[in-house]
Amino acid sequence: MSGRNRGPPPPSMKGGSYSGLQAPVHQPPFVRGLGGGPVPPPPHPSMIDDSREPQFRVDARGLPPQFSILEDRLAAQNQDVQGLLADNQRLAATHVALKQELEVAQHELQRIMHYIDSLRAEEEIMMREMYDKSMRSEMELREVDAMRAEIQKIRADIKEFTSGRQELTSQVHLMTQDLARLTADLQQIPTLTAEIENTKQELQRARAAIDYEKKGYAENYEHGKIMEHKLVAMARELEKLRAEIANSETSAYANGPVGNPGGVAYGGGYGNPEAGYPVNPYQPNYTMNPAQTGVVGYYPPPYGPQAAWAGGYDPQQQQQQQPPPQGQGHR
């Protein structure tokens, strides 16, 4: 027991080690043996005397030196036990103090941990806020880019609208001029209306004249057919007369010159095979409307006051001069 070396307690303690906290070291006031600790108290004077002269001095009790040595050793061990008890008490007090300090340190550590957790929560909140701000900033930047593109588009639209406005201004100017001309033309509308009314009246009169001429043409066409049949009959009779005259002339040449029996007169000279027909002494019993000559599809009859009957009857010429049937020339 005298050779024990009581140094500082080990660093590892119950409850774990905590960084930043160092347990206080309790140093006993004296340590037996070789340890380099504090200086022990001086021994008892009797022991000093015994150590100086052990072989020459006898114990007062009359004991031999060996028993006195054992007794001294027991006393020393008793003293060591007392010292160990004192050390144990001091260690118990130190343990209680360390335990209290540990509780305080744990409480402080918990407070620090809570503070660290709060700091971490605040840091996370700040990081989230910063992230949200960065996201909002990025969205705002994108919106700014979109707004820039839209502004450029708006500027292009403004240029187009400006050019369109100029074109519309020129068109409005032209339309104003056209409106002025139309206004001048509108002022002439009453005159044009009067002219249109006059033209309508003339057209109605022309239609009435055309209807009248249609009726007259139908009547004249029927009358012309009758006259045609009569003329054909007269032409046949004239041919017969010509044949008879030719036969009589032939017989007269054969019999010699004789007078003209019957007093027949020949027109155009003697010996002319085509005797001239006399002019028609009869005038037609209808008159021509001078407005009818300009009507499209109108064919005047092949007779009238200007027609002179001369020469033989030509059926082909009569067919060419014959007007179309009623209903085809007037539509």
Swiss-Prot record:
UniProt xrefs under InterPro entries: FLX/FLX-like
Stretches for region Disordered: 1-51, 306-331
Organism encoding this protein: Arabidopsis thaliana (Mouse-ear cress)
Family the UniProt entry places it in: Belongs to the FLX family.
Keywords noted in UniProt: Coiled coil, Developmental protein, Differentiation, Flowering
Source domain of life: Eukaryota
Subunit structure, interactors included: Interacts with FRI.
GO cellular component, one term: nuclear body
Protein name (Swiss-Prot/TrEMBL): Protein FLX-like 1
Pro residues bias (residue ranges): 322-331
